[in-house]
């Protein structure tokens, strides 16, 4: 099920964020960087974002649930990078992560659809996102 995230999701978001990072970036980022990730720190970050009305107004966070557990999420909002704003990218997709076991089920497309609709509802028609050049699976998905 796709839905907007709430502050009650912060703990699960933190856990999924770290697990998905470890799955996605193993072999692409230094092990020390991955080992330094903390579900508690990520949960606190999501609690700040979801609990702050000014942050929530700028950032939309969606979750995918399977059997009442969050298995993926995406976030989008106003472009934070001034260089990209100057190039006409007024919006950004700041995160999209799915646990590997949940990939290939259409959840990623559902998240992208929700974020695209959110961005369009804000009057934007150009969006940017960052992806590692070496992350072939993600690049294939976005293309």
List each model region and its residues:
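Conserved active-site tyrosine of GNAT-family acetyltransferases
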Residues: 142-143
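Conserved beta-strand-loop-alpha-helix junction that forms the acyl-donor binding cleft
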Residues: 129-139
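Acidic/polar helix N-cap motif
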Residues: 6-9, 135
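Short acidic/polar active-site loop segments enriched in Thr and Asp
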Residues: 125
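Acetyl-CoA-dependent GNAT
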Residues: 4-7, 15-28, 32-103, 109-114, ...
């Amino acid at each position: 099920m796709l839905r907007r995230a709430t502050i009650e999701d912060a703990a699960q978001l933190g856990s999924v964020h770290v697990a998905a990072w470890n799955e996605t970036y193993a072999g692409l980022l230094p092990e020390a960087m991955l080992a330094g990730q903390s579900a508690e720190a990520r949960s606190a970050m999501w609690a700040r974002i979801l609990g702050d009305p000014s942050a929530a107004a700028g950032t939309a966070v969606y979750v995918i649930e399977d059997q009442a557990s969050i298995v993926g999420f995406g976030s989008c909002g106003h472009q934070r990078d001034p260089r990209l704003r100057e190039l006409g990218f007024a919006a950004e997709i700041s995160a999209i992560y799915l646990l590997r076991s949940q990939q290939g089920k259409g959840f990623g497309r559902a998240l992208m659809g929700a974020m695209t609709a959110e961005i369009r509802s804000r009057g934007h028609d150009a969006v940017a996102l960052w992806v590692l050049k070496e992350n072939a699976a993600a690049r294939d998905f976005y293309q």
